[in-house]
A protein has these predicted regions:
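Short, small-residue-biased leader/transition segments that mark boundaries at the very start
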Residues: 1-8
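Flexible, glycine-rich loop/tail regions that form catalytic "lids" or insertion modules at the edges
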Residues: 5, 16, 33-37, 45, ...
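C-terminal catalytic subdomain
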Residues: 19
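Phosphate-centric recognition/catalysis
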Residues: 23
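Hydrophobic anchor at the start of a short beta-strand
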Residues: 26
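HKD-type phospholipase D/PLD-like phosphodiesterase module
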Residues: 29-65
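HKD (HxKxxxxD) catalytic microenvironment of the phospholipase D
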Residues: 52-124
Length: 146
């Protein structure tokens, strides 16, 4: 799972496609643009990407790796845009605290199920929203942390 502002860099997208083809399930919550196309058979059918633009300018940099059933959690500064990956020093740091890990997982999970502002990012440029019961991730996160 990942949350980032933009997924642009060709090498990053290629690596995500390679992981998908190898059977890795990938969930991505983004705020802005994305050159990744999810849901293509035999290329990105293991990738789900949800884009959310809502009231708050929230765009977490969270990475969660399943790691064979022993999840590893990271937070970082990387925005996954070429200017940031090439011209800046970006960092990731592991998160070991279980309460913090639960918060990070909640942030990703809420984003993936946002039916009010979460649009399916599939490269078609459509406005298809995530299906399900009404759920607004930013509002629910606000309530959880209030």
């Amino acid at each position: 799972s990942s949350a980032a502002s933009d997924v642009y860099k060709r090498q990053m997208v290629t690596k995500l496609y390679q992981a998908s083809k190898a059977g890795v399930k990938i969930d991505i919550v983004i705020r802005g643009n994305c050159s990744l196309v999810s849901g293509i058979a035999k290329l990105s059918d293991n990738i789900r990407c949800v884009g959310i633009i809502d009231r708050y300018l929230e765009h977490s940099r969270i990475l969660i790796f399943a790691n064979g059933g022993k999840p590893r959690y990271f937070i970082g500064s990387a925005d996954w845009m070429p200017r940031n990956l090439i011209n800046r020093i970006e960092v990731l740091t592991p998160v070991y605290d279980e309460d913090m890990q639960a918060d990070l997982l909640r942030t990703i999970s809420y984003g993936m199920r946002d039916t009010m502002n979460g649009r399916v990012v599939d490269g078609k440029g459509g406005k298809e929203f995530v299906e399900g019961e009404p759920f607004r991730s930013q509002e629910e996160l606000y309530k959880a942390y209030k």
